[in-house]
Amino acid sequence: MRDLPLTSLALVLSALGALLGTEALRAEEPAVGTSGLIFREDLDWPPGSPQEPLCLVALGGDSNGSSSPLRVVGALSAYEQAFLGAVQRARWGPRDLATFGVCNTGDRQAALPSLRRLGAWLRDPGGQRLVVLHLEEVTWEPTPSLRFQEPPPGGAGPPELALLVLYPGPGPEVTVTRAGLPGAQSLCPSRDTRYLVLAVDRPAGAWRGSGLALTLQPRGEDSRLSTARLQALLFGDDHRCFTRMTPALLLLPRSEPAPLPAHGQLDTVPFPPPRPSAELEESPPSADPFLETLTRLVRALRVPPARASAPRLALDPDALAGFPQGLVNLSDPAALERLLDGEEPLLLLLRPTAATTGDPAPLHDPTSAPWATALARRVAAELQAAAAELRSLPGLPPATAPLLARLLALCPGGPGGLGDPLRALLLLKALQGLRVEWRGRDPRGPGRAQRSAGATAADGPCALRELSVDLRAERSVLIPETYQANNCQGVCGWPQSDRNPRYGNHVVLLLKMQVRGAALARPPCCVPTAYAGKLLISLSEERISAHHVPNMVATECGCR
C-alpha cells in the first residue's frame, strides 16, 4: 500500500472511512475529542454578525470559554488540529525542530520564522480567522503539482501568512524550489519528524491552473526523486485508516479592524458627516445649449432606481490622458463607420479654451470634412431609431421626452441640416448607452437572450465567470461537495464578441443587425462553447464508485 499512487482507490478508501465514521489519526498523535469544539451559543456574539461557515476550536484549556478559541474557516481534520497544537506547544528546541523537519538553524529557513509567527498567533488569536484548504487534485508528471480548494469569498486576498503542511513518510533531505515559494527551502525529515512545512508567498497559484508545482532535489545527490519516493515522502501513511495523509494549505488573512463585542452589546460610533467637496458641486451651465441639454438628459436617466440623486463624477483630463487611447480621425468617414458599428462608450473632450470661454467653438465644422451622403443618412436613421426605442422603454422620468425632443431639434443630423454632424454622432452614442442600461431595468423580467443583450451591461463583454455549484443536494455524490463549474455572463455586442476564436459568421451578422436597430426575436446570448470533465465519487447500489463525468465545467464562452 506504501508504493501505490494517489488514485481513485485511495480516494474511495478515504470516502469510505468518512462514511463509516472512522477517525483519521496517526498512531503517535494524541486523540482529539469533542472537548476541543466550541459552539456558537457558548460565546457572546455581536448582534447582526454574519452567519459564516466558522468552526471554533480550543487547542488548550477547557471548552467553557475561558481560553481564546480559534476561528477556523474550512474543514479542520484531526491532522490539522494536531499540527496546530504542536506549533502552539513548541519552544523551538532541538526536539521541536526535529518534529517539524527543520534543518540546522544556521541554514536559511523560510518556514521557521513563519512557524514562530503562527505559534504566537495561536497563543493570542485576537479574533483573526484561519483558513484551511484541503488538497483537491495532484499530478506527478513532469513535476509534482498540488491543487487545493479555492478559498471562500473574501479569503482569496494576499494573506499575512501561508503555510503548506505535509504529513511525511520516510525520505531523504531535500531542497524544494518553484514559483510561489520565497526562494529555496530545505526539508530534513528524520525518525522524529511528524510534519514538514513550506512557506508560500504567492498562495493564489495553489488553487488556480494546475496548482502549486514543486521541484524536490535530494541534498547531496544529482538525480531526482522517483514518483514512488515522492509519494512516500509527501503523502505519509496513516496505518489506522489504511490510507495516505494529504497536505493542507493554511492561510492567515490580514487582520482587519472590527468592533469588539462586550457581553452581547456592540459600541458603535456614527460616521462623521461628509465634508463639502468642490468636485461634487453643480457645474455652471454650459453656454452651448446642445451640451447643456444632453448633460441634463444623461443625468436624468443615469440616476439609479433606488436613490433620488447621485453624486456627479468629475473627469480629470490629465488622468484620462494616462489611459490607453486610440487615435480616430473624425474627418474620415471610414473611422466614423467603425464607431457606428459598435456600442462602446465614446468620450469627447473639448479644448480647455472652448470649455472656459463664453462662446465655445463648435465640435466640428461640417464643411471641413468629406461627409458622404450615405453616412449622414445612416447617422440620422440610427439616431431616430435609438430615440424611438428609448421613448418606448417603461419607467422613464417625465423629463425624458421634452429633453430628447429638444436635442433632436438642435441636432438634425441630415447632410443638409444646420446641425453639426459630430453632434449627431455624440447624441447617438449617448442614446445607445442609455438604451442598453434601461433595457436591463425592464421590470417584465427579460429572458436569457435579453439579459445577455442588455441587462448584464455592467458586467462587461461576454466572458467566463466563476460559479461554485453545491453538490450536497445530490445525495448520491460523495466527493466533491462543491466544485467550480463556472458560467458565461456578459454583453453580446459588436465588436467585443468576436474576441472568442470560436465565433461564427451567423452571430456576427446578428450582432450587426442588432446594432443597426433591427428587432430580433432572440438576440445573441452569452453561452458556454467548451467544457471539461470532472471526477465524481458517488454511492450507487451500496457501492462506492469513481467515474469521470464529461461536460461538468465551462471553460470557454461565446455568443450564439
UniProtKB/Swiss-Prot annotation:
Which residues are listed under the site Cleavage?
A: R451, S452
Q: What is its main location?
A: secreted
Q: How is it modified after translation?
A: Preproprotein is proteolytically processed to generate N- and C-terminal cleavage products that homodimerize and associate to form a biologically active non-covalent complex. Binding of the non-covalent complex to AMHR2 induces dissociation of the pro-region from the mature C-terminal dimer. The N-terminal portion of the protein, despite having no intrinsic activity, has the role of amplifying the activity of the C-terminus.
Q: Which GO terms describe its biological process?
A: anti-Mullerian hormone receptor signaling pathway; cell-cell signaling; gonadal mesoderm development; Leydig cell differentiation; Mullerian duct regression; negative regulation of ovarian follicle development; ovarian follicle development; positive regulation of gene expression
| Residues carrying sugar | N64, N329
Q: Where is the segment annotated Disordered?
A: 259-287
**Expression across tissues:** In ovaries, AMH is detected in granulosa cells of early growing follicles.
Q: Please provide, in alphabetical order, the Gene Ontology terms of the cellular component aspect for this entry.
A: extracellular region; extracellular space
Q: Which residues form the propeptide?
A: 25-451
The keyword Disulfide bond is assigned to this record: yes
Its quaternary organisation is:
Homodimer; disulfide-linked.
Provide the protein name. Muellerian-inhibiting factor
Q: What is the protein's species of origin?
A: Homo sapiens
Q: Which gene encodes it?
A: AMH
